[in-house]
Amino acid sequence: RPIHENNPHYAVLDVRQVGAALQNDGYDGITLKKGEKYDFSCFARLADDGKGSKVIVCLLDQEGNEVAKASVKVSSKDWKQLKAVLTAQEDVQAAKLSLQPAGTGTYHFDLVSLFPQNTFKGRKNGLRADLAQALADLHPRFVRFPGGCVAHGDGVDNIYDWKGSIGPLEARKPLRNLWGYHQTRGLGYFEYFQFC
């Protein structure tokens, strides 16, 4: 069963031998700045065969070396939100996020998130500070959201509906876009209004 009816898909990691990991490269890699803190969160649960285990959460550089590390514990067959803070030990241009259970079993993960603590106006899950500040410095009289192809989609079933972009992140209805990738809608109407 999914975490929410609007969000029916989640990752299943069947660990038969310790060492298996779920990794995400981000969009062209995750940029890390030495000394900065990054908030990790995800929803996780055990499948029926699971016994529970610590999960090592780490950020890896291009060579696979750990540059930040924390751990969370998956111990329930119900969805639970897990959180950790990772501190980058060095600058990395194209890091990847890795989730590695310390025990065998089947793990379910959803809404895996990594955000810098240094966001525009310090908002949790906020906008990238440098980009948002550059836009704010222009003092625009209006901003369009959603814009372009996101607004009209590729048909009636894919038109942007603002109601799917508000509320708890895990309850927001994901949307595929014309560029061929998936949007969680973590940046929805509420976040855009906050920015404005």
Predicted regions located by residue number:
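Extracellular and organelle-lumenal recognition/adhesion modules and their flexible linkers in secreted
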Residues: 1-187
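A structural motif corresponding to the C-terminal end of an alpha-helix
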Residues: 189-196
